[in-house]
């Protein structure tokens, strides 16, 4: 700059600064003026700031920040939904969470983004599973064509949810892949200890979902066989995780008990359907 020249004006506050100011409201009064104790206004202000920040952090070059912001927006919807009594509004809030996370998850295909894709995938799958469970509980309200249409839609949503869980498991296993010279170990043994619980929970929920059949097909046991295989894998991985790590004795105890019950029950049900051509009841 030449001597005597007028210095350039400082740049306007960045969107990142607006986002950070949520932790220190006095720095950004425009976000908090008039909110007072109204949580709905605070929620809307948070969403506005997050969306401005996300528009600034384009995906290229700011991947981690973009993921963090998407998860924060999802958290906003999660918190505001905790005491939502209306079914339709609650389901819409859950769909909003999926909408702000799943496109980003789908965009992160590069191997370097395995951990971020897994993080997003686990949250998306959990929300989708909650949507499936809520819809399933309301099926008894319908009959005839309306029931059949909802059953078909729910079957497709269930499959989508399981696919997202499976992708999460795949990303975790890939992120823990064996290096040259390593002693061969299973994916559960190679995972970081902080990831084990999420990995096991994903396996268990996917096993339960695969066992649900909203559109019955006489003689079809494929979903039951897949569910049985997953329950057995849960038991094997729990044993491997406990052996490889200093986990408490009651780790995954409730889920493990349910897995063992299903491993005992399912073969009889599968055999019955194969021999009679009947329909396997939901389990």
Residue ranges of predicted features:
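Helix-turn-helix repeat elements of alpha-solenoid scaffolds
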Residues: 37-52, 90-102, 155-180, 223-230
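Residues that mark the junctions of alpha-helical repeat units in TPR/alpha-solenoid scaffolds
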Residues: 46, 59, 64-73, 97, ...
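Flexible helix-coil transition and linker loops at the boundaries of alpha-helical arrays
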Residues: 52-66, 103-117, 168-196, 241-244
């Amino acid at each position: 700059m030449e001597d005597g020249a007028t210095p350039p004006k400082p740049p306007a506050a960045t969107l990142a600064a607006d986002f950070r100011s949520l932790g220190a409201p006095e720095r950004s009064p425009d976000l908090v003026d008039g909110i007072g104790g109204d949580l709905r206004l605070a929620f809307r202000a948070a969403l506005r700031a997050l969306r401005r920040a996300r528009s600034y952090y384009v995906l290229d070059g700011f991947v981690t920040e973009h993921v963090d912001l998407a998860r924060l927006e999802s958290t906003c919807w999660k918190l505001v939904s905790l005491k939502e009594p209306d079914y339709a509004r609650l389901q819409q809030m859950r769909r909003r969470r999926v909408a702000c996370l799943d496109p980003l998850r789908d965009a992160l295909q590069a191997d370097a983004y395995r951990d971020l894709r897994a993080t997003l995938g686990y949250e998306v799958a959990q929300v989708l599973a909650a949507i499936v469970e809520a819809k399933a509980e309301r099926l008894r309200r319908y009959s005839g064509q309306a029931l059949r249409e909802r059953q078909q839609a729910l079957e497709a949503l269930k499959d989508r949810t399981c696919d997202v869980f499976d992708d999460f498991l795949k990303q975790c296993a890939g992120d823990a892949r064996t290096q040259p010279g390593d002693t061969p170990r299973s994916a559960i043994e190679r995972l970081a200890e902080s990831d084990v619980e999420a990995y096991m929970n994903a396996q268990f929920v996917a096993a339960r979902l695969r066992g649900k059949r909203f559109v019955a097909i006489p003689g079809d046991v494929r979903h039951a066989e897949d569910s049985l295989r997953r329950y057995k894998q849960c038991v094997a991985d729990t044993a491997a995780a406990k052996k490889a790590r200093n986990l408490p004795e009651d780790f995954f105890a409730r889920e493990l008990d349910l897995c063992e019950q299903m491993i005992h029950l399912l073969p009889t049900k599968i055999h019955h359907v194969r021999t009679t051509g009947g329909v396997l009841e939901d389990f």
